[in-house]
Amino acid sequence: KDKIMIYGAMLAGGVGSRMKSAVIPKQFLEVEGKPIIIYTLQNMLKVDRFDYIYIATHKDYLAYMKEMVQKYTDKPEKVRIIEGGKERMDSIHNVTDAILKDEGVHEDDVIVIHDAVRPLVTEKILNDSIDAAGTYGACVCGLPAVDTMLYSEDGKVVTTIPERSKLFNG
């Protein structure tokens, strides 16, 4: 294969266990009549540079995710839905395995990994990430931290308060 491939990977394998009140995983909660994950997907689909977007979702929601892609997107052929893993890293592993199986891999190919419950991602952030990964081999997005962070060795006593200007939310 001669063409450098660019893949989007949306991680949606969680079941929202930290959201005790949720009946369904938070990525499927609706805002203005649409699941959050669909807003994220629609923003990723605006980036024409993505050859495919893989969505790693919980096995119990594979069929539902396929329905949502058909219902809400105009490019369902660019979306591939796979089973997510137990943990975030397992889902990333499943995506990379699926890409390897489906497409093969070239060392210059790019995979942009994004959390499905972060729907406000912009085309600029995604395109800048693709460019940075192409230039440097890898990149991670981050925003300057606005909250004061506390560090504790034992989880009980604050050891230090890191300088906020050196901290970023990833």
What are these regions (language model features)?
Residues 107, 120-170:
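Conserved core of the sugar-phosphate nucleotidyltransferase
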Residues 63-68:
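Acidic helix N-cap motif at the loop->helix transition within catalytic regions
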Residues 105-117:
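Short beta-strand-to-loop acidic/aromatic patch adjacent to the donor-nucleotide binding site
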Residues 70-107:
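Short phosphate-binding loop-to-helix
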Residues 41-45, 69, 99:
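Hydrophobic C-terminal alpha-helix "anchor/cap" residues
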Residues 4-62:
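N-terminal glycine-rich phosphate-binding loop and ensuing alpha1 helix
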Residues 10, 37, 95, 114-115, ...:
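Residue-level signal for inorganic ion chemistry
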Residues 51-53, 78, 137-138:
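Residues at the starts of beta-strands that form the adenosine-phosphate
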